[in-house]
Swiss-Prot record:
Phosphate binds at S98, H129, R149, F150, H151, A181, S285. It catalyses: inosine + phosphate = alpha-D-ribose 1-phosphate + hypoxanthine; guanosine + phosphate = alpha-D-ribose 1-phosphate + guanine; 2'-deoxyguanosine + phosphate = 2-deoxy-alpha-D-ribose 1-phosphate + guanine; 2'-deoxyinosine + phosphate = 2-deoxy-alpha-D-ribose 1-phosphate + hypoxanthine. A purine D-ribonucleoside binds at E266, N308. This is Purine nucleoside phosphorylase. It comes from Anopheles gambiae. The gene is pnp. Keywords: Glycosyltransferase, Purine salvage, Transferase. One of its GO terms (molecular function) is purine-nucleoside phosphorylase activity. Residues 1-42 are annotated as: Disordered.
Length: 353
């Protein structure tokens, strides 16, 4: 039997194994003008809804998969649930990375919601991620803060990992500040450095894994859109000014970030390859959140706290672990709190002009 999937006796199979998701993959070498190998049409064995879709749009325009994310109505329901329970109307959303959740603890006059109490919300399972959505004031500015995010390695599709960004958008946030803990792939970096993200390489997207896969809802944004200057250059420039003001300019970097699937750390060969591609920091988050935010038209600012140096030689002893990563974040909480507070203040000031 061919290694490619085709319809046989009404079932899609690959090497004799039915597809677990129940959807049928189609290939031109198995069909001619929409005719299946068994003599019927390519749509005969599909669910009725798919057959109806094919009848109006043709056999080669049938949905490939169901959307793995949330519908607009479901996300609107989440946003409404939250807005009915807080008087705050934030314009800035913040995502706290591993060990950086204490940023949310600097908010005042808070309304907080555990993820498990919010309808349709996933639950964070990683140490260092509290799993709480917090509304409050940071430097006198209303914000909403994710105290813990969702990762692909927890078993969530990327669309679900990035779902809270769309909720932020529906609540009224125009800006996203994303933070993460990352490994330094640039040998000039040091543990404790803050790297402003000027660009990213979407490696998971190279493999066809994107948070926007599936049907597009124009109410969020267009099907196709550009990603140049995704990380707002003006905010990055202002961040450098702020770093000088609070005396951390020597610890501030600017570079390229990439996201791997995790949960394992990178091999030496992988780090060498990514360094050759121009990657300065490696993590397991952020990229899909930023893509989703840009799709919604949000302005993005992001930075990585370098919590470990990637292992770049087989002679090195691999010392980094998740506990030490969380520890670095806690050691830098005061500095990062001041840094983010001033960024938020600047965003608020610029919006009032």
């Amino acid at each position: 039997m061919s290694k490619f999937s085709y319809l046989q006796n009404g079932k899609a199979s690959t090497n004799g194994v039915p597809h677990a998701n129940g959807h049928h993959q189609q290939h031109q070498n198995g069909h001619s003008n929409g005719v299946a190998r068994n003599g019927g049409t390519a749509t005969d064995t599909l669910p009725v809804a798919y057959q109806q879709k094919a009848a109006t749009s043709g056999p080669f325009h049938m949905p490939r998969t169901e959307h793995v994310g949330y519908t607009y109505d479901t996300l609107q329901e989440i946003a409404t649930y939250l807005l009915e329970r807080t008087e705050l109307r934030p314009k800035v959303g913040i995502i706290c990375g591993s060990g950086l959740g204490t940023l949310a603890e600097q908010l005042t006059d808070v309304d907080s919601f555990d993820y498990e109490t919010i309808p349709h919300f996933p639950v964070s399972t990683v140490a260092g991620h509290v799993g709480r959505l917090v509304f409050g004031y940071l430097a006198g500015v209303p914000v909403m803060c994710m105290q813990g995010r969702f990762h692909h390695y927890e078993g969530y599709p990327l669309a679900k990992c990035a779902m809270p960004v769309r909720v932020m958008h529906l609540i009224g946030c125009t800006h996203l500040i994303a933070t993460n803990a990352a490994g330094g792939a640039n040998p000039k970096y040091r543990v404790g450095d803050i790297m402003l993200i000027k660009d990213h390489i979407n490696l998971m997207g190279f493999a066809g894994n994107n948070p926007l896969q599936g049907p597009n809802d124009e109410r969020f944004g267009p099907r196709f859109f550009g990603m140049a200057n995704t990380y707002d250059p003006k905010l990055n420039q202002q961040a450098k000014v702020i770093a000088r003001q609070i005396g951390i300019e020597n610890e501030l970097r600017e570079g390229v970030y990439t996201c791997l699937g995790g949960p394992n750390f990178e091999t030496v060969a992988e780090v060498k390859m990514l360094s050759m591609l121009g990657v300065d920091a490696i993590g397991m988050s952020t990229v899909h959140e930023i893509i989703t935010a840009r799709h919604c038209g949000m302005t993005c600012f992001a930075f990585s706290l370098i919590t470990n140096m990637c292992t770049m030689s087989y002679e090195e002893e691999e010392e980094h672990c998740h506990d030490s990563i969380v520890g670095v974040g806690k050691n830098r909480e005061k500095t990062l709190g001041e840094f983010v507070s001033r960024i938020v203040k600047h965003i608020h000031y610029e919006a009032k002009k």
